[in-house]
């Protein structure tokens, strides 16, 4: 379309002109104001048609937030747990005042069948995040994926490559990058007021290690209630135990998650945002001390320290009080930010 406002024909204007042409005919024709986006309504042509993949826990919270947006029309939900997908459908139908929300047990079916879906929410367990995002973008969907975006560097690189190749919008849950206290710290670091940043810190909240053992085998539930193979997805097979599925128990196991990404998905992104990463790469990684602190060195000489504060996410540290923080040190001073921050 032309950039000239006089010649641009948007979908909204196209529909409006079509309605005017119809009214010129000697035929009775009624178009509701809501169909044209009048009276505060969003025209169907301007709505974002969405589907959800993984609607338990964080996914349930995200679903509620997105349903509150007037522009969003939710048409499908997918969850490997029957109880969750049915609860999500009922919630969507109640909010939208119809019974149109379709349910799926397998995301691949949703992505293949729902050509009307513009974007998907992905809030599965961490093990599925990267692969589900890649499959969705290949199917022509834009993606909002809960953090962490991936479990490995190779997965992350493939997610980025797929978004570029298929020209898709991809966003992961790094909301602290837009919260005022973190924005202030990041902008201070980049402004030069602290001088050239030489050291940055990020709180990764690493615990005492991930479990590698198996829970005792239990009988698998019926596949229509929970398909265990689909739940495992890209992970190595192990026998079913409800302890993995209920209450986020999977999060403590190396095959299903990476503990560093719990807070690191936020804090490392915040630290990197405050540094000038143009043509910069990581050149060295080294563990220091008994608390799993990792010191990384960048090719521009900056040192990035990823450290574990302690067992409690609210345990104070020497740099700040509060969770999920970052700090930048320069020759002229320092700045730090964290959730519910108070200075040391």
Where are these regions (language model features)?
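Conserved structured core elements
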Residues: 126, 130, 150-153, 179, ...
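Glycine- and other small-residue-rich loops at beta-strand/loop junctions that grip anionic moieties
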Residues: 122, 148, 174, 260, ...
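N-terminal glycine-/serine-/threonine-rich beta1-alpha1-beta2 phosphate-ribose binding loop
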Residues: 2-145, 154-169
């Amino acid at each position: 379309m032309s950039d000239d406002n006089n010649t641009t024909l948007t979908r909204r204007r196209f529909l409006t002109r079509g309605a005017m042409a119809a009214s010129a005919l000697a035929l009775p024709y009624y178009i509701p104001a809501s169909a044209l986006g009048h009276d505060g309504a969003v025209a169907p042509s301007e709505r974002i048609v969405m589907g959800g993949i993984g609607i338990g826990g964080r996914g349930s919270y995200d679903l509620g937030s997105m349903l509150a947006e007037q522009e969003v029309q939710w048409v499908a939900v997918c969850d490997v747990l029957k109880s969750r997908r049915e609860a999500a459908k009922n919630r969507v139908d109640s909010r939208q005042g119809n019974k149109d929300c379709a349910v799926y047990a397998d995301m691949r079916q949703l992505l293949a069948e729902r050509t009307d879906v513009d974007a998907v929410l992905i809030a599965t367990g961490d093990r599925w995040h990267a692969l589900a995002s890649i499959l969705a973008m290949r199917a022509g969907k834009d993606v909002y994926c809960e953090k962490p975006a991936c479990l490995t560097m190779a997965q992350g690189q493939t997610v980025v490559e797929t978004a570029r190749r298929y020209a898709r919008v991809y966003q992961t849950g790094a909301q602290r990058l837009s919260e005022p206290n973190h924005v202030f710290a990041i902008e201070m670091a980049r402004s030069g007021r602290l001088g050239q940043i030489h050291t940055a810190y990020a709180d990764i909240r690493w615990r005492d290690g991930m479990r590698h053992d198996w829970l005792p085998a239990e009988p698998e539930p019926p596949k229509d209630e929970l398909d265990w193979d689909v739940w495992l997805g890209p992970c190595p097979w192990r026998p079913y135990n409800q302890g993995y599925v209920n209450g986020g128990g999977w999060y403590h196991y190396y095959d299903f998650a990476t503990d560093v990404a719990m807070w690191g998905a936020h804090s490392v992104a915040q630290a990197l945002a405050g540094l000038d990463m143009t043509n910069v790469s990581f050149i060295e990684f080294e563990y220091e001390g008994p608390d799993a602190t990792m010191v990384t060195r960048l090719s521009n000489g900056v040192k990035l320290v990823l450290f574990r504060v302690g067992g409690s996410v609210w345990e104070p540290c020497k740099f700040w009080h509060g969770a999920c923080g970052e700090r930048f040190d320069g020759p002229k001073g320092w700045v730090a930010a964290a959730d519910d921050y108070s200075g040391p």
